[in-house]
Each structure stands twice: as C-alpha cells, then as structure tokens.
Amino acid sequence: LLFAAGFETTTNLIGNGLISLLRNRDQMQMLRSDPTLGHRAVEEMLRYESSVQLDARTALEETDIAGHHIDAGQVVLTLLGAANRDPDRYQDPDRFDITRTGTQHLSFAAGIHYCLGAPLARLEGEVVFERLLARFPTIDADTTPVWRPSLTLRGLETLQVTVR
C-alpha cells in the first residue's frame, strides 16, 4: 500500500514541481542560488500544483457546513487543489512563490486521513530539486507538457526536457 500510494504522488510532485520552476524561471534561479529554500520550495510546489486534487469522505454524522446541510452517510467531495488556491487563505494564490510562508496546504489531507508518507515525499522532493539544480545549470522544456487526464490526480503524462 505505501509503495503504490507514494509512488505516483511523489512522481507527480517532482514533475509538477519541475514544470512550475520552468514556468517561473525567477523562482528556479532563486532556489538554485539559495538551496536552503528547498523546504519552502517543495511546500509551495505541493500547494501550487497538488498531486491529489480531489478526495471523497463519508460524513459520520449530520452536520451543516457553510450553510449546506450534510446528512450522516452522505459522501462529500473535498477539492484539495482548489483549497490550496483559496484567495481567502493565500495572498496571491495563483502565483508560484517559493518564499511563501505559512502555507499549511492540504496536499497531504488532514486529521486522521493525513498521509503517512508526507515526510518521505517532502524529503524526496527536497533531495531531487537540490541535486537537479546543482548538477545541471541549464534545464529547458523541449515540448509543451501533456497532463494526464484525471479528476483525482494531477500529474504530467509527458514533459521532455534538455539538461546541460
């Protein structure tokens, strides 16, 4: 379960993070110049292009949320990717900013459903981007990225790059 659950989402973190850096060269240069921003950069990658976009939960008891009645047993869809771009929560939410603080995104869910692999995924992301940017001074996208069609997961199907 851990291997299957963590593989695709971590792969998506790396691909989504790379395309975010390629589309925001100033942020790539900032991270390259200051590798200590690695943790913040990965948090912003997770917030900005969440690997998991949608999740379903079943209400255990009757409740009201934001004026909407929910019956016990009713399935509720949580739009994690949308929550991570909530303008009431994040200043300028559609801007990719690796210096952003206080992200507290929902990319790994929350509460009893919080992802067990979150610390490992964060570490893998930090190591990948630190090594990638240190080793290759030039990284360029050769083609337009193709996103995998999915309602629940956001990840690239293809992204061809040249590294030098």
Segments and roles (model prediction):
Residues 1-164:
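Cytochrome P450
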